[in-house]
């Protein structure tokens, strides 16, 4: 089982190489598009990405409710049941991996939420989908951190080792707490709360982006766009 899971994780990481493909006519790689969108003065892309996260979660929840029930024998000898598959197949891993790749491109698209939803849409059990999403994210996040530090070191501005370490540690702590929160949401069957949260946040973000576009002013800083 462990060897199979390791193989599925390796397959799930393969789509990340798509991020290094060149985008025709731009002179940039696919991963650079995300940095461009995240650093621009508008937030409408983030708003739509949050709504996409919400839509994926709602679809995943619906698919999970209709997933096949599997029976198993518990340690006490009694028969238990679980909704959805616990084993990943190659197509499942590729689907989740491509979704993770999309989350790396679109700022605002929740990596954990979207990859978990992809697993649910493939008929995977909620807990299994969450565990796979978590483990799949570890090498991806570490690789992103290494690339970010590498790019920062290459910049002419001296950021400082202390500042970089503080940034990495903060990101790791926040990511850990976010995963713990998502695990609690899944174990207490409150995944819909996360879906509604991203829905409301997405709507608010789009409203703010429209107001900023009309006024030409950043609502939070008061500076012109």
Show which residues each predicted segment covers.
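Multi-pass membrane proteins that catalyze or facilitate reactions on polyprenyl-/lipid-phosphate substrates
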Residues: 1-106, 113-225
